[in-house]
C-alpha cells in the first residue's frame, strides 16, 4: 500500500479509469454480439441498424483512448465484411 498522498490518489484514479474502461469494452462486445446475432438471423435491416450502432460505439471508445484507433478500424472492417457478406 502506498504511503505518499499522490501515490494513494493515483491508485484511486487508476481504479476508476480501469472500471470505466471495462464498462466501455463491455459495451463494444455487447454491440458486436447483437450485430452478429442479427446477421445470423438473416435480418438485413436489423443488421444494418446494429452495425451503425456498433460502429458508433467502437469509434467513441477509440476516441476516449480505451482502444487504439487502428484496433477500432479493424473491428469495424470485420463487421462491415460480415454485413456485406449477407448479400451473397
From Swiss-Prot:
The keyword RNA-binding belongs to this UniProt entry's keyword annotation: yes
Superkingdom of the organism of origin: Bacteria
SUPFAM superfamilies reported for this sequence: Ribosomal protein S20
Keyword Ribosomal protein listed: yes
TM ranges: none
Cystine connections: none
A molecular function GO annotation: structural constituent of ribosome
InterPro entries given in the database record: Ribosomal_bS20, Ribosomal_bS20_sf
Keywords: Ribonucleoprotein, Ribosomal protein, RNA-binding, rRNA-binding
GO cellular component: cytosol; small ribosomal subunit
Any GO BP: translation
A Pfam family per the record: Ribosomal_S20p
Functional description taken from the UniProt entry: Binds directly to 16S ribosomal RNA.
Protein family membership: Belongs to the bacterial ribosomal protein bS20 family.
PANTHER family: 30S RIBOSOMAL PROTEIN S20, SMALL RIBOSOMAL SUBUNIT PROTEIN BS20C
Record protein name field: Small ribosomal subunit protein bS20
Species this protein is from: Clostridioides difficile (strain 630)
